């Protein structure tokens, strides 16, 4: 490995690397090299590659330092040559910064050290050379503080305690009777350096390292070590950044923003990262170093006059006060500002994306320390992409790929007002099951949510230990849903996403007492009627009412969706159970309904009575009487769906849940039902007990119901076909697909298809008319995937129900996985939650096999998925490459799936 190049130098408009070497040099190192090559003023330095980070963890510190030493010493000589200073010299000491830089931007997640090379001799030399002793000692103080924290582990002893260095600074300021760090004198700073080093000796038992080379190796290894710190690991997990990528380390000659009033440091953006507005903006501080801007120790000032005036207006600062106390860089250093503005424009035009820039002004000279593609909100992401397309900076394909599918979520749901959030009190945190923001009074039962909306026109927060299909109406009428149990694909989560409702699930610390109608959590007692607020994007629950604002879907969003459609191969449908859901999905660009769950319709109004009548009937004749009552209701529902979808395909799933989900389980409700049906209570109780199942997910449900009670399939088929023919008569085309759930054996499906076909023929004969329809099945039992060649003899389409297919393939209950999932993720047993991101090697392999076998039997077999994975970007990508025809997801995930489908097609091309 000795011949492997581990260090790449840059400086004086030359560089050994370039902007295309992100994998090797990290984003920062690659861009520092590229900025040099295009003539931007950048302090000279070198970058140690990401491969060395992997070596560090594989071989250890000592081996890696040995491998690096010759190249680092050579690279340091290059900096010395370009600066005229020498590392470790007593007369002209070279000071450097040591920074991390992964290939994906991870702002603030890893460690940085400034002013490295400082010691008792260097500080005197710097003071003499600059004729500015205060600056020299301030730089020394900062170095000891940063090095002590990052390399020597000088952290607070507990979360209740403060940073040990900050405590010493506060004590010094109190002793001197001053408020700001900048008010400390040279002698104060000398005293602080002495006290800092004493604190290091006391806590570590070692003297603070004085040798610059020892300092450098300590810093380089600490930056590599920070790749595996807690916050970096969490950030990578949240942003799907692989741990094996590693970080590069960039070492640069220091330039100083803290040399006096002609020096400054700042951060700028070429466009507004929050709104996407084409407005150069940023903050700076006079006489400061980089970390001061982000640390918030002093109030940063705005770079532009326009930005400064906007800031002053928001802060109720007068124009006179703004000019005197908080002037913009444009006003204070107009020549430097002009150069900075030209550079940011040059960088944006060159990299063709919004730039996040770090800069330092040393004694009136501007230096660029970093540029990277800036992080941005979902709204800004779309606006910037579409603006740059209109400006001719990027083409259509780039505009589509520039927008992250998952970030579209931010545009589709209500959000909390940012100002109100600052004062919000978090009482518990659960899983961010369905994005958005919701606020309202607490209720514990679905009927109370319905009642509150009906009587008070107020949407409540429905709080449940867990939800069931019976809670559907209450969930619909609620502002948001909070559950103590359940994961990201639990009933509450799936249904809430389908409705576009804010939902926080799996908040296990909640102690819910249905009888007392109270919640106890973390020392709070919340009673029914008390207000709480839910953040479905973070999983946080707040005490009281937090103001919300509706998401604003601009014209740019619509244009992006049109581009997504243009470049997609995979179609996107929606899971929708009502005409309202269908209309919402259609508005978001759904090209059909991939899953209509007929059981959800059974809970509307008085229908549940007819359903229960059917379930509790003694014989087939009794069931048929009850089903006859349901027929017109179901027919009306389907008519609404067919009309809403305007000729796009509608896939209707026949009854799926076990019958016990539809019957009352409490004595009071059972007695009311007995009274309504005019039968003894004991008969109802006995029947309910008889319907109970030990493992209902694998029990009497799906096609098993239709095969044991054929009259259910008959009624539903008749309702579907009659509705389709009624809508067809109005001149609206209808494309009907009838889907049989939970098939594991081709004979099950054949039996159901015979019932469907016979019933359809009866309707055609009665009406003296016909229409085309298809019969297919959900592939959710692993055996169905393995025997897909047989099932395709009967089925005209496959729809993969990935929720249940995942449960049965992995043997995980999606409602109970929260008990062990965090441990499995932490230990690396699982890479992702398989109910959120499709398990490609297991479930995915079954899907590929089923598609291959199915199309071997029926060449034009249409295949799609209708589980929640249909709206998850990486799962959508898998579906594209697996050769599926469509994905189907919740209406509010349709835009995400559409964009993900376009990404997959463009990546393949």
Where do the protein language model's features map onto the residues?
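Short beta->alpha connector loops at strand-helix junctions that form conserved
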Residues: 46, 484-486, 505-508, 596, ...
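Short mixed-charge
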Residues: 77-89, 519-521, 761-770
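C-terminal accessory/binding modules appended to enzymatic or scaffolding proteins
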Residues: 14-22, 434-477, 843-859
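Conserved alpha/beta-domain cores
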Residues: 99-100, 553, 563-909
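Nucleotide/phosphate-binding sheet-loop regions of phosphoryl- and nucleotidyl-transfer enzymes
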Residues: 1-424, 458-461, 468-473, 479, ...
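Glycine-rich phosphate/ribose-binding loops and adjacent secondary-structure elements
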Residues: 365-367, 468-476, 480, 488-495, ...
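Long, charged amphipathic helices and adjacent flexible linkers at domain junctions
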Residues: 70-73, 238, 400-454, 458-461, ...
């Amino acid at each position: 490995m000795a011949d492997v190049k581990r260090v790449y130098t840059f400086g004086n408009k030359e560089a050994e690397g370039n902007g295309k070497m992100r994998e090797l040099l990290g984003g920062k190192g690659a861009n520092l090299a590229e900025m040099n090559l295009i003539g931007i003023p950048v302090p000279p330095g070198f970058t140690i590659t990401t491969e060395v980070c992997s070596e560090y963890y594989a071989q250890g510190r000592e081996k890696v330092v040995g491998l690096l030493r010759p190249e680092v010493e050579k690279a340091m000589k290059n900096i010395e040559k370009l600066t005229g200073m020498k590392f470790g010299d007593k007369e002209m000491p070279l000071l450097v910064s040591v920074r991390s830089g992964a290939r994906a931007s991870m702002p603030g997640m890893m460690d940085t050290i400034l002013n490295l090379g400082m010691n008792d001799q260097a500080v005197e030399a710097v003071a003499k050379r600059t004729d500015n002793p205060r600056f020299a000692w301030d730089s020394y103080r900062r170095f000891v503080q940063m090095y002590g924290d990052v390399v020597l582990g000088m952290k607070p002893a507990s979360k209740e305690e403060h940073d040990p260095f900050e405590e010493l600074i506060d004590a010094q300021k109190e002793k001197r009777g001053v408020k700001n760090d900048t008010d400390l004198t040279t002698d104060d700073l000398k005293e602080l350096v002495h006290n800092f080093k004493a604190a290091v000796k006391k806590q570590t038992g070692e003297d603070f390292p004085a040798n610059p080379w020892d300092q450098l190796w300590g810093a380089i290894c600490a930056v590599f070590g920070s790749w595996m710190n807690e916050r970096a690991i969490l950030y990578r997990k949240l942003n799907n950044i692989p741990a094996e990528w590693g970080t590069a380390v960039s070492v640069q000659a220091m330039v100083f923003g803290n040399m006096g009033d002609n020096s400054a440091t700042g951060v700028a953006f070429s466009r507004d990262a929050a709104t996407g507005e084409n407005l150069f903006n940023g903050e700076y501080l006079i006489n400061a170093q980089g970390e001061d801007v982000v640390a918030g120790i002093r109030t940063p000032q705005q770079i532009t006059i326009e930005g400064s005036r906007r800031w002053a207006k928001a802060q109720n600062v007068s124009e006179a006060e703004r000019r005197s106390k908080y002037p913009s860089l444009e006003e204070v250093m107009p020549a430097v500002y002009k150069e900075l503005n030209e550079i940011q424009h040059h960088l944006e035009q060159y990299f063709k994306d919004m730039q996040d820039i770090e800069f330092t002004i040393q004694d009136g000279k501007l230096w660029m320390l970093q540029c990277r593609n800036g992080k941005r909100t979902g709204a800004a992401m779309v606006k910037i992409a579409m603006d740059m397309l209109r400006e001719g900076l990027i083409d259509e394909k780039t505009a589509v790929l520039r927008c992250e599918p998952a970030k579209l979520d931010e545009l589709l749901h209500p959000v909390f007002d940012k100002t109100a959030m600052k004062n919000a009190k978090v009482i518990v945190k659960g899983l961010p099951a369905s994005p958005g923001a919701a606020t309202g009074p607490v209720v514990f039962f679905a009927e109370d949510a319905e009642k509150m909306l009906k009587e008070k026109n107020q949407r409540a927060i429905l709080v449940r230990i867990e939800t069931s299909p019976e809670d559907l109406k209450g969930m619909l009428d609620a502002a948001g849903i909070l559950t103590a149990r359940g994961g990201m694909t639990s009933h509450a989560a799936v249904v809430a996403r389908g409705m576009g409702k804010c939902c926080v699930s799996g908040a296990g610390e909640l102690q819910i007492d249905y009888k007392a109608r109270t919640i106890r959590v973390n020392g709070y007692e919340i009673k029914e009627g008390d207000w709480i607020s839910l953040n479905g994007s973070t999983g946080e629950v707040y005490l009281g009412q937090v103001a919300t604002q509706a998401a604003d879907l601009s014209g740019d969003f619509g244009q992006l969706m049109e581009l997504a459609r243009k470049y997609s191969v995979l179609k996107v449908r929606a899971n929708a159970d009502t005409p309202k859901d269908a209309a919402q999905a259609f508005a978001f660009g759904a090209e059909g309904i991939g899953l209509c769950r007929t059981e959800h319709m059974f809970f509307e109004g008085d229908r549940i009575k007819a359903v229960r009548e059917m379930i509790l009937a003694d014989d087939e004749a009794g069931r048929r009487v009850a089903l006859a009552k349901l027929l017109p209701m179901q027919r009306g529902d389907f008519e609404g769906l067919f009309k809403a979808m305007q000729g796009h395909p509608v896939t209707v799933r026949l009854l799926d849940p076990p019958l016990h989900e539809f019957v009352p389980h409490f004595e009071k409700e059972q007695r009311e039902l007995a009274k309504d049906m005019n039968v003894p209570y004991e008969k109802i109780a006995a029947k309910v007990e008889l319907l109970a199942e030990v493992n209902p997910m694998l029990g009497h449900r799906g096609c098993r119901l239709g095969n044991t009670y054929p009259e259910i399939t008959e009624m539903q088929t008749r309702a579907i076909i009659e509705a389709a023919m009624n809508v067809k008569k109005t001149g609206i085309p209808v494309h009907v697909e009838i889907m049989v759930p939970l098939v594991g054996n081709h004979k099950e499906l054949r039996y159901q298809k015979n019932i469907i076909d016979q019933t359809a023929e009866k309707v055609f004969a009665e009406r003296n008319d016909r229409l085309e329809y298809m019969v297919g099945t959900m592939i959710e039992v692993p055996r169905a995937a393995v025997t897909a060649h047989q099932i395709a003899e009967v089925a005209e389409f496959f729809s993969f129900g990935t929720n249940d297919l995942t449960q049965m393939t992995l043997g995980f209950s999606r409602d109970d996985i929260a008990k062990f999932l965090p441990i499995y993720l932490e230990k690396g047993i699982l890479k992702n939650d398989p109910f959120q991101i499709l398990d490609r090697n297991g479930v995915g392999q079954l899907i590929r096999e089923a598609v291959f076998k199915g199309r071997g039997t029926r060449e034009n077999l249409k295949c799609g998925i209708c589980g929640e994975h249909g709206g998850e970007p990486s799962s959508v990508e898998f579906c594209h490459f697996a050769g599926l025809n469509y994905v189907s997801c919740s209406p509010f995930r349709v835009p995400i799936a559409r964009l993900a489908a376009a990404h997959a097609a463009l990546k393949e091309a």
